[in-house]
Amino acid sequence: MHEQYQAPLPVNSPALPEPFYYLHNFRAVLAWIGERYADLLDDQERAFIAAFAELPEASQALLVRMVMRKGTLFREGKLAYAEIGDTRAAVQPLLALGWVDAQPTLELAQLFGLLKKDELSQLFRDHLGRANLRKDALLERLQPLFPEARRLAEWQADFAEPVYELRCMALCDRLRLMYFGNLWQDWSEFVLADLGIYRYESVEFSADSRGFRLRADVDAYLHLFDCRQRFDLGEPLEELLAGLPGEPYANPWLEGRRVKLLFQFAQHCEKQRDFDLAQRLYRQSSHPGARLRAIRSLERGERFAEAHALAREASCAPESDAERQGLARLLPRLQGKLGLPRQARAAAPEIDRLDLCLAFPSEPCSVEWAVREHLEEPGCAVHYVENGLINSLFGLLCWEAIFAAIPGAFFHPFHSAPADLHSADFRQRRAALFEACLGRLEDGSYRDAIRCRYRDKFGLQSPFVYWELLGEELLEQALDCLPAAHLRAWFERLLEDIPGNRAGLPDLIQFWPAQRRYRMVEVKGPGDRLQDNQLRWLQFCREREMPVAVCYVRWHVDD
């Protein structure tokens, strides 16, 4: 294919002025892990850290470049970097350590990932005739003819450009997991922080602050992550369930991941109409909503007596407002199926209704924005806030509690939220801090506290504050027009169930600054209906006589 391979000239990295920025970050991670996780490392991992420190700088940099790239297979020409220089020289120590392989065995799909279409067409010309197929169609045609993996030289003897396979990716992923406490964060966090794109709150935590206490916990996380990946790739559920621990993990955080995976497996079964397996998996899971889905699966499987018994049990102690709402629908229906007296449903508070017939927008815009434009008038400001305003005010007022250095909540510099944010004991572990923050609503100091946090923390990552939404005008109108008692009620509800209650708030908020009053408005276009979490928030507000309305929109189209 190539008579002689000539590597392209390397180019400078555009990311940061310091050419080895990524290497400095990787070294910092290794030092952090060595300081905090030495007791969780095995001999291979310790040897990796020690050997990495002894490598020439160019070899260190090349390895880190490969680790940060997508995949594990690279043509040499794709590894050309000005700061590294001669790629072939830099890779030699990595080959000697076995961290990189210069003779990888490639399946056909991997070969297709490396080569361009014209290279593939030339390589397989004897099998294609005159067919001019897309690359994916070409792979589909050739797959039955080449089921076995081969070395590159066996695929193409005269392919002159070296291909390298990274062999230590699993080890590096494990180190990344130990540092971040998860696998959804990656090495780009450092770059985004260095560039100022993301800025994080500085939390003081000690050297023993870490995400994992036991090596077995790291193993368990990786196992659950692998199960989820295999599930996404379509591996039979029976095989996955056989490898999933049947007993709860002692670590609450890992147990949360296990029961969530069971919940996701059960959802899959429910979609496949395997209601028996679905209800069994739901009942093995304590993930929020699992019990309600188990009842629903029993009902759909026409096991009405079992569904009714479980629903009665749940109604004695609902786990959340969402479950209470679902049970209020399910129980009367199940009672009807069983010929039992139907339980009367409590009457929901009357929600103010606003009906609008608006001219169809001449330019594309959302129905919420059209209503905002219609409602705004002199003396009345209208903002499209949805969940952003109340969450932001809560996040600013309670900043100290949210970012308190509670053990296990923060263990690296890139936390946008405490690791236990969704834990059942999140508030309890910070009870005094939250009470102090919320107490400002009682003594009137909350306005100054929120303004101070807005100035001091502006732009820092937060799980609650929508900086792009919360301009100073909106903030001041909210502080002037929203009663402290209403803020306290909303914030208390958020803390009761953060994952369940942080969404569902009305789309718009109207302010009448001169009168220091407000109204929240949920907007529904033609064919839209209120979602369950929206209904719960609307009911919550009306029960407390908070001004809220639902606006139903019809479009008027001129002939």
UniProtKB/Swiss-Prot annotation:
InterPro entries reported for this sequence: Fan1-like (IPR033315), FAN1-like_WH (IPR049125), FAN1_SAP_bact (IPR040603), tRNA_endonuc-like_dom_sf (IPR011856), VRR_NUC (IPR014883)
> Among its keywords, does the record have Metal-binding?
yes
The note on the cofactor says: Binds 2 magnesium or manganese ions per subunit.
Q: Name one Pfam family in it.
A: FANC_SAP
Task: Say yes or no: keyword Magnesium present.
Answer: yes
Q: Which Gene3D superfamilies match?
A: 3.40.1350.10
Q: Name one GO biological process term.
A: interstrand cross-link repair
Q: What residue stretches are annotated with the VRR-NUC domain?
A: 443-555
Enzyme class, one word? hydrolase
Residues that bind Mn(2+) 1:
507, 522-523
* Annotated phenotype, changing residue 534 to A: Loss of function
This protein's source sits in the domain of life called Bacteria
The effect annotated for residue 524 to A is:
Loss of nuclease activity
Q: What is the effect of changing residue 522 to A?
A: Loss of nuclease activity
Q: What is the effect of changing residue 507 to A?
A: Loss of nuclease activity
- Per UniProt, Mn(2+) 2 binds at 386, 507
**What does this chain do?**
Nuclease required for the repair of DNA interstrand cross-links (ICL). Acts as a 5'-3' exonuclease that anchors at a cut end of DNA and cleaves DNA successively at every third nucleotide, allowing to excise an ICL from one strand through flanking incisions. Also has endonuclease activity toward 5'-flaps.
Q: Report what the protein is called.
A: Fanconi-associated nuclease 1 homolog
Native species:
Pseudomonas aeruginosa (strain ATCC 15692 / DSM 22644 / CIP 104116 / JCM 14847 / LMG 12228 / 1C / PRS 101 / PAO1)
Native organism taxonomy: Bacteria, Pseudomonadati, Pseudomonadota, Gammaproteobacteria, Pseudomonadales
